[in-house]
Curated annotation (Swiss-Prot):
Belongs to the LptD family. Residues 1-29 form the signal peptide. GO terms for cellular component: cell outer membrane; transporter complex. It holds the Pfam family LptD_N. Together with LptE, is involved in the assembly of lipopolysaccharide (LPS) at the surface of the outer membrane. Disulfide bonds: none annotated. InterPro entries: LipoPS_assembly_LptD (IPR020889), LptD (IPR050218), LptD_C (IPR007543), OstA-like_N (IPR005653). This is LPS-assembly protein LptD. Keywords: Cell outer membrane, Membrane, Signal.
Length: 810
């Protein structure tokens, strides 16, 4: 309660402090975000909301001078002061008006009547009735009050507002609460009584009902809601979806606020075609440098087990579960970092992610990653180590080698006329023979690899507009390799050259020393030109690279973490043909490329076109596997990349690699996108030769040849349509289809989305079709009910939305 000392030395107490009482919403597991930020119409919806007013930092509101104005002041016998007629009191940002105010100096009671208006910069309260307050007890009571929170759409009314215990305890009787604009009250929460303890996180309401327009739709004998940006134990709103695979899918989360830096969410997920799954997530942050979470979900008995061959042929019963652990720690002023990312499902439960779509885990090419990393980082050197294992989610896939562990050291030094880099790595490669045996795939070779490579880079020319660099590298590798007798047939085939009768792998110590010489240079030419009636700047940037690495036979070395690099413009100017260290390709190659860019007057890049090709003086002889044929091509595919910002709405991208020896395109991608305010539409295409499974014969490969269409567009101020469509042209399969419709008004929204997705069964590799319906209903400022995306995302279950436009500042 604030005591105002007036110029007449008659104090008046006007104690309105309702802000925490007027921000009810659903129980939430994460801090609230200050409104208004509730929809696509914020600028139109909330222009009536008053701004928050505060005194300058360091100023005490109670120490500000008080100004009082009234038509009449009367001091009555007995110590009563009466203010009548247009009473106005001002103190800093505080404002109080009424028709009549009376102060009893003996009882310290204050009464204000008629046209009561109170504004403290954070809330406005009005009433045509009576305000009663006592300066000693600091208790106040207001009849038939209306309130509006500043900086927020929260508003409402109460038949009676009672404030006690120095305004810490507030009771609203006959209360109403909404975030809808005046005259558009689609929903209102009405309660017989609302109690607020401002020292607590949540308020409580009894005999509450939710009204849509003039009709009650839900009744709550009791409900609590947050009044602060903090968390509290309680039920979260349930979620609902309907899918062809799981049937009716209902989730009911319970949030447990264990401590300010520890919490847990316990969710019961009922799927009528599968059973009851329990999900538990525990989050912890003992201090900001140490953060992590543990997540577990368990389905004791999947009702689909007996009816699904890919389950009952691989699992002994219908028990299915997932475990995920994530942790990050920082030490020594963030110079030392430790992280854990571990995800596991039951062994041989290959379709777990297809069936339940958990939102945790790092999954790459149907492999669950399980890693522990630690590193120490300084300005010119770093030392890091990693232990990494995998769980395969594809029944027919070969196990990758595991890092048990990898230790990596990097050193950098920049001199006046040279740069020195030194990379050293020691890796022990293991193999999960147990999991491979469960797949009937046999064992694999293992080994320890030591690699070190000092690199000296010397700029020969470094002038404005052109450069020429030389690079010298010496690469030493040492393997200590073990080759099992019962090696997997997959590896046996890969390491048996055509026409030979045995594998080329050697057991024991193998060393490899290779030098590398690289010469790379480029030039930049510029000219001014006209760009659709405006000035523009065009560049022409030719570049070249010569790379020499001598040949050394490496067929006796296993392939542990290496693969062929993706072919594109940038890979042609790399010093590697293979990613990883197990294969260092011989090279006697010249790469030539040219890029042109167009910049407008504002400096924005509008066009980028690049074309490049590499030419080998001698075709490379190093192969990834000995069973492969020797390369005969002495030139790489012709690579093209192009991007254009046609105007502020239209963007285009195209890329292709053309194999001139085979006279065919090896890969291509393109996209055309239109953007205007909230409208986004995109047509895209991608092609990669021999990069897909043949769905009619899973032992064969097929071309990846897919077209996609995406759209999100407002139909009017409230309705929004969005969707996506992906189709495989080669195999005639609709990969993913999604359509959604969202209604978004100032105080509520509803979102429907329907999706059909074809995903391969990870055991049979046959496509399985899944249909799902998501519904999301939101009463802004109160909470949401349902599942699925609240927004109008262009992501689909199978593929994410990507803007493939490689322009600067775009």
């Amino acid at each position: 309660m604030t005591k105002w000392t007036l110029g007449y030395s008659y104090p008046i107490a006007l104690t309105i402090s309702l802000i925490p009482a007027l921000t009810p919403a659903i129980v939430q597991a994460a801090p609230l975000t200050p409104p208004p930020a509730t929809g696509i119409l914020d600028g139109l919806c909330y222009d009536y909301v008053p701004k928050v007013e505060k005194l300058a930092p360091g100023k005490d509101a109670n120490a500000q001078p008080v100004e009082v104005d009234a038509d009449r002041l009367e001091a009555k016998q007995g110590g009563t002061a009466v203010y009548q007629g247009d009473v106005k009191v001002r103190q800093g940002v505080r404002k109080f008006d009424s028709d009549y105010a009376e102060l009893d100096q003996k009882s310290r009671d204050v009464i204000a009547i008629g046209n009561i208006y109170y504004n403290d910069g954070q809330i406005t309260v009005t009433s045509d009735k009576t305000l009663k307050s006592n300066l000693d007890t600091k208790n106040s009571e207001l009849e038939e009050g209306k309130y509006q929170v500043h900086g927020s759409p929260v508003r409402g009314s109460a038949d009676r507002v009672t404030m006690t215990n120095n305004n810490q305890n507030i009771t609203l009787e006959g209360a109403q609460y909404t975030t809808c604009p005046p005259g558009q009250e689609v929903w209102t929460l009405k309660a017989g009584s609302i109690d607020i303890d401002q020292t607590e996180v949540f308020g409580e309401a009894w005999n509450a009902s939710l009204w849509l327009y003039d009709y009650p739709v839900f009744y709550f004998p009791y409900i609590n809601f947050p009044i602060k940006d903090e968390r509290k134990t309680g039920l979260l709103y349930p979620g609902y979806t309907q899918s062809s695979k799981n049937g009716m899918d209902i989730t009911q989360p319970f949030y447990w606020n264990i401590a300010p830096n520890y919490d847990a969410t316990i969710t019961s997920r009922f799927m009528d075609r599968r059973g009851l799954m329990e999900q538990v997530e525990f989050r912890y942050m003992p201090d900001p440098a140490h953060v992590g979470s543990l997540y577990f979900e368990n389905l004791a008995d999947d009702k689909q087990y007996d009816e699904t061959p890919s389950l009952n042929e691989k699992l002994s019963d219908g028990h299915r579960y997932l475990l995920n652990a994530r942790h990050t720690s920082l030490f020594a002023d963030n110079a030392m970092r430790v992280s854990v990312d571990y995800t596991k499902v039951r062994d041989r439960d290959y379709n777990y992610f297809n069936d339940f779509s958990p939102k945790v885990g790092t999954q790459v090419e149907n492999q669950l990653q399980q890693s522990l990393m630690a590193g120490y980082f300084q300005q010119n050197w770093n030392l890091n180590t990693e232990v990494r294992t995998y769980q395969i989610l594809l029944a027919s896939a070969q196990q990758p080698h595991e890092l048990m562990p990898r230790i990596n050291h990097n050193y950098y030094h920049q001199g006046n006329w040279y740069d020195l880099a030194w990379n050293t790595e020691v890796t022990r490669f293991g193999y999960n023979n147990t999991q491979a045996s469960a797949q009937n795939l046999g064992d694999a070779y293992t080994g320890t690899r030591v690699y070190t490579a000092p690199t000296l880079t010397m700029p020969l020319i470094d002038e404005a507009g052109y450069y020429l660099d030389s690079q010298y590298k010496l690469m030493y590798t040492r393997y200590d390799q073990e080759v099992p007798d019962n090696m997997s047939s997959t590896f046996t085939k890969r390491f048996t050259p055509e026409g030979a009768s045995g594998v080329t792998l050697d057991e024991g110590i193998i060393t490899r020393t290779l030098p590398s010489f690289r010469l790379k240079g480029g030039m930049t030419f510029e000219r001014n030109q006209d760009w659709f009636g405006g000035d523009a700047n065009q560049t022409l940037e030719p570049e070249f690279q010569y790379l020499y690495v001598p040949y050394k036979d490496q067929d006796n070395i296993g392939v542990y973490d290496s693969t062929t690099m993706r072919q594109d413009y940038y890979s042609l100017f790399s010093d590697r043909r293979y990613a990883g260290l197990d294969r260092i390709s011989d090279s006697n190659r010249v790469s030539l490329g040219v890029t042109t860019r167009v910049y407008d007057q504002a400096g924005d890049e509008r066009i980028r076109l690049a074309v490049a090709q590499a030419f080998d003086f001698v075709a490379p002889r190093v192969k990834l596997y000995p069973s492969e044929s020797l390369a005969t091509n002495t030139r790489s595919p012709l690579s093209f990349e192009g991007d254009a910002k046609i105007n502020e709405q239209w963007f285009a991208h195209a890329g292709a690699q053309y194999d001139m020896d085979q006279s065919e395109i090896s890969s291509a991608n393109s996209a055309l996108e239109y953007r205007r305010e909230k409208l986004i539409s995109q047509l895209n295409y991608r092609f990669v030769r021999n990069a897909n499974y043949d769905l009619s014969n899973t032992n064969q490969v097929a071309d990846l040849n897919q077209v996609g269409m995406l759209l999100t567009t407002p139909l009017n101020d409230q309705w929004h349509l969005y969707g996506g469509y992906y189709h495989d042209l080669d195999q005639g399969v609709k990969v993913d289809r999604k359509v959604g419709l969202k209604y978004d008004s100032c105080c509520w929204s509803i979102n429907f989305n329907l999706e059909w997705v074809n995903t391969p069964d990870n055991v049979t590799m046959r496509p399985t079709s899944e249909r799902s319906l998501g519904i999301q209903f939101e009463m802004k400022g109160l909470g949401s009910v349902g599942t699925g995306s609240k927004g109008t995302s262009l992501d689909t279950e199978a593929l994410p939305y990507i803007r493939p436009f490689n322009l600067r500042d775009q």
